[in-house]
Amino acid sequence: MELRVGNRYRLGRKIGSGSFGDIYLGTDIAAAEEVAIKLECVKTKHPQLHIESKIYKMMQGGVGIPTIKWCGAEGDYNVMVMELLGPSLEDLFNFCSRKFSLKTVLLLADQMISRIEYIHSKNFIHRDVKPDNFLMGLGKKGNLVYIIDFGLAKKYRDARTHQHIPYRENKNLTGTARYASINTHLGIEQSRRDDLESLGYVLMYFNLGSLPWQGLKAATKRQKYERISEKKMSTPIEVLCKGYPSEFATYLNFCRSLRFDDKPDYSYLRQLFRNLFHRQGFSYDYVFDWNMLKFGANRAAEDAERERREREERLRHPRNPAARGLPSTASGRLRGTQEVTPSTPLTPTSHTANTSPRPVSGMERERKVSMRLHRGAPVNVSSSDLTGRQETSRMSTSQIPSRVASSGLPSTVHR
């Protein structure tokens, strides 16, 4: 039996869950495109989806803010329909063997600071900054970072007067302990500074592969939070960032120096990392680590397949010279995939030619690739925070291998 939502969206398989609801793959029947559908039982003790959808609507139009297609109630469920996005940074981090290059970390940092700045400009703090809550776009938007999950977001100032909320103590920890700011651990009301400090820990997580306070054992959740807090406070920033450019320590020291109601200097923090990016000689080609890994994997698989076909062809036509070097153009389509032509160029341009891992002639065989369905979330983007050329990535996020693409949403995503 076909299940429909809002008389327009066909409900498909479950692709994720969170503490505030489950996420399903869906189809917009009128537009013939996939969407993400978030469901929350109306009988839940503390309904959150309606509040979250209202925050999403207030954020609409911003760079990297998910587009909401429909909200309402259907039977016993509150429903929010959003456009479909690609994998989270946590998914991609695992795909890249839990280590990002400095270039990738800096490309991400630039966009992530901008996402947080935008949310703050709309009078909210996110309060759950972590890799799971940043997703990459699909297709033409494959180089852009999106921020999701406003289930824990809170208004920190009055929209009209900009009067800041009062300083409070003895607050319970809200968010994810691994990335929580020290003040959050101490029970202090969160403000803008805490979102940015959390981002600093996320960036060092990407650099290091793990944080010193991961994997601590404790009998209860409260005791574990206390152990994480103790380890975090006893680890000097310079020790945490040892072996990495000083900008990361400078960033964290700046965030920790902010007072409760201070407005952070987002431009200064962005410029800190942009200057490092340029000093390292990196190019704003928006080729991330996962693009390069997939590119190499495609090349190896294609080369092996081409050699196999050439051997078979030579055996069938040993005297036919045209049989040698036959390109491998035939490919069986996988069930549940669609062939697309990537929007990003697959041939090197003047600023990417030096980094191309394969010759131009081989790239033509990449023009048609299989795109698997990815985890749900929405899309809305502008190029205002991209200082480089976003259309030069050789492979888009939508082309990462199925072990990431089809993995679905982690259980901690999309509360």
Curated annotation (Swiss-Prot):
Residues 380-415 have a biased composition (Polar residues). Residues 301-315 have a biased composition (Basic and acidic residues). Its main location: cytoplasm. PROSITE patterns: PROTEIN_KINASE_ATP, PROTEIN_KINASE_DOM, PROTEIN_KINASE_ST. The keyword ATP-binding applies. ATP binds at I15, G16, S17, G18, S19, F20, G21, D22, I23, K38. Residues 317-342 are annotated as: Autoinhibitory. SMART domains: S_TKc. The keyword Nuclease does not apply. One of its GO terms (biological process) is Wnt signaling pathway. GO terms for cellular component: cytoplasm; nucleus. It catalyses: L-seryl-[protein] + ATP = O-phospho-L-seryl-[protein] + ADP + H(+); L-threonyl-[protein] + ATP = O-phospho-L-threonyl-[protein] + ADP + H(+); L-seryl-[tau protein] + ATP = O-phospho-L-seryl-[tau protein] + ADP + H(+); L-threonyl-[tau protein] + ATP = O-phospho-L-threonyl-[tau protein] + ADP + H(+). The active site is at D128 (proton acceptor). Residues 9-277 form the Protein kinase domain. Keywords: ATP-binding, Cytoplasm, Kinase, Nucleotide-binding, Nucleus, Serine/threonine-protein kinase, Transferase, Wnt signaling pathway. SUPFAM superfamilies: Protein kinase-like (PK-like). Exhibits substrate-dependent heparin activation. It comes from the Eukaryota. Autophosphorylated on serine and threonine residues. Residues 301-415 are annotated as: Disordered. Belongs to the protein kinase superfamily. Casein kinases are operationally defined by their preferential utilization of acidic proteins such as caseins as substrates. Central component of the circadian clock. May act as a negative regulator of circadian rhythmicity by phosphorylating per1 and per2, which may lead to their degradation. Participates in wnt signaling. Monomer. Interacts with per1 and per2. Component of the circadian core oscillator. This is Casein kinase I isoform delta. It comes from Xenopus tropicalis (Western clawed frog).
